[in-house]
Amino acid sequence: MKRYVVGISGASGIVLAVTLVSELARLGHHIDVIISPSAQKTLYYELDTKSFLSTIPQNFHNQIVLHHISSIESSVSSGSNTIDATIIVPCSVATVAAISCGLADNLLRRVADVALKEKRPLILVPREAPLSAIHLENLLKLAQNGAVILPPMPIWYFKPQTAEDIANDIVGKILAILQLDSPLIKRWENPR
């Protein structure tokens, strides 16, 4: 069993976080979840609920720990604890900017800062379009420091039919980067 931190910032696309946390739990992993206040609002706007756990099958709840964004004393904030990877999905450009400047003023930003300084996997799923030169510079800076930048782009050659298909494909890409085995991971095969 591995331990993952999933940070959820206020960008649109919270279904990606729900899908990721559900699949990591289904695969038997421990997940520490940090939800920003803006993400709480997005959760309500996009999924009609104020409770993140209500979006996750109940049999997985014992594998998930919710951390308050101001709980800077949380165990996940320390580099002395083993976290296998940190994923921020969706990741707002405000969060990208803060992380790229080393601003660790809340738990979400702190865990990203720790991942970078400890050279642990950090996957950012920025949900913004179009991107300004400032956004691109911040993303470049993070990529140069070891973060994986994974924009949530649909994988059209798999011919998604629903929003759920698109979310599953994007989460499959995250899981592939984490080198996990999941039915959500699709591999291209040459057509015959």
Curated annotation (Swiss-Prot):
EC numbers for this chain: 2.5.1.129
Pfam families linked: Flavoprotein
Keywords of this entry: Flavoprotein, FMN, Prenyltransferase, Transferase
UniProt GO molecular function: carboxy-lyase activity; flavin prenyltransferase activity
Keyword Flavoprotein in record: yes
Sequence intervals crossing the membrane: none
Binding site for FMN: 10-12, 36, 92-95, 127
Matching PANTHER family: FLAVIN PRENYLTRANSFERASE, FLAVIN PRENYLTRANSFERASE PAD1, MITOCHONDRIAL
NCBIfam families: PRK06029.1, ubiX_pad
Protein name stated in the entry: Flavin prenyltransferase UbiX
Organism of derivation: Chlamydia trachomatis serovar D (strain ATCC VR-885 / DSM 19411 / UW-3/Cx)
Record gene name: ubiX
